[in-house]
């Protein structure tokens, strides 16, 4: 009996255990769901080492769609908690989400490889290798700024579809995956849904279209009501004088928007009358008296247009040489990481937002964190150069127009910029601008061109071999290739005798290239006289500048059927100012100052270059009147401040690397100058000379400078002193002092007179002067 009772109790215990297990099974699913949701939250917010590790693993798998993994985990957890069974991964919603995710990964990877191909960074055809390089080699899984595509899963999908149906087919496959995912996610077939919804959509469109047409068609009665309403609105209201007095007595000023709006209305109301008055006055002023023809005031350099003249083509210049900068692309990501780590090691939190690869330097745009002083970033220049192993860096803090700091790092290989590619660029290149000159390309690679008549004068300075003469040649070539000889004339002064002589004979010259420094001051004075003569013309014709005068000449020619020449622009080019300042500093400085102050309206522009940017060459008066500056590499920050009124030029690389500070700009722009070879210059010059010979203006050619010895009244002891010096064959001031018992000033004056007349030679330090005259010549 006892055994039978034990057998009966055993099944009862098993049933109780099974009952407890069946009650606990839903709780396990609840616990599993809660744990999965917790893991997903840790992944999303990257809590601790586990969160960051899971997030990095998610980026490795899914790339830029790494957030989808924790959300898929949350969806799976909810299915566990609701369905209370394993196998939820086969659920229709989960499968639909996976299809949609796969399409997004494929789209992202197609875009990633298009970007890599356009950036010329793609080194192989293997999608898996290139993705591994982006994710692991370049530390992409820890960098949240760059694009990662679809991760390794996206790389597998892209590699599979690319090998089967190419890149375009991979995009089509992505669309198909997206449609399949939407169908599975919604649980509705696509075609029946479209068949059901299309008529409803078409009816809505028809109703809206009919309502719009009905609203646009108005009855005659409605039109009359609208016209009456508009008349009542436009009818002026009577002015209440009491309100005006109250406004006048009110001392509180009106708010700024009201004042602005009120002023704009007044200007709009009174502007037509003022414009008509100005036009009538201008017509009265510009109308010449028939008794005073235009030819009473001839313009130097004016000539009739040679209609057969053809501008030189850009094909005469060498085509740009393609440069390989693939090595620089590999360094960009690594240098960006080094910059962020270097700043972080000094307690400065920053982020690299943008990188510009230029011809000579790479510019990294740094966005500092809130509360970081710009001065702290600038003070770390040497540490940044050490971290990047760079020869020298330049920091632009801040970048004008941006809330970022620019760090310019020299490239390992400098890409040459040709003048042809700059002149052929479509950026800032109006065809009607005759004085548009090409300078080069900036850090972002954009062609930099500027109009000389807007500068209006430019000072170019830099050390020897930094690229000044090439820049001057590029400016001259730009003008020759855009302007005909009757439109622009030039006066060239080249004391070095080798830089500008190649342009001798071109029809744009007013006079042959001036190479004698003593004639240069005279040439500048001739240009000043031409400027004064032009202002007399402006006064006579009632115009204010060269553009107004040329418009007046065209109107005069049309009205009187005459052909008076237009007034040409004049560009004065001085290749070495230091030599001129040594020979005739006062005359040169006065002429340059007058031209810089007044010549802009007369159409005369200065281009002055020097390799000695010191204060005795670039004086304060010259700097004050020449607003635009171009600085090449200099030896010290003092020279940079002399040119730009600020440091920066001492960190340039040379070979055309320049800082361009146009008039009105707050900070200079870094440019890699355009290179033009001697062969290109000769080709263009020969092409121009073959079409038209130079017609020099006699009034602008400097005359021979005669060196006349000063024949002032000689000292009464002069003849005796000469006789003594010739007899003794030696001469000195102290000897004349002792022999004739005179003071030092009188003795020195006698010796100077002897030197001026060729009796004695120049001083040789502490030695006596050498006597040039012999006794036989003296007796003759």
From Swiss-Prot:
Keywords: ATP-binding, Cell cycle, Cell division, Cell membrane, Chromosome partition, DNA-binding, Membrane, Nucleotide-binding, Sporulation, Transmembrane, Transmembrane helix. ATP binds at residues 465-470. It is a multi-pass membrane protein. Residues 1-18 have a biased composition (Basic residues). It is found in: Cell membrane. InterPro entries: AAA+_ATPase, FtsK/SpoIIIE/SftA, FtsK_alpha, FtsK_dom, Ftsk_gamma, P-loop_NTPase, WH-like_DNA-bd_sf, WH_DNA-bd_sf. Residues 212-229, 275-294 have a biased composition (Basic and acidic residues). Belongs to the FtsK/SpoIIIE/SftA family. PANTHER family: DNA TRANSLOCASE FTSK, SPORULATION PROTEIN RELATED. Homohexamer. Forms a ring that surrounds DNA. This is DNA translocase FtsK. It comes from Sporosarcina ureae. The gene is ftsK.
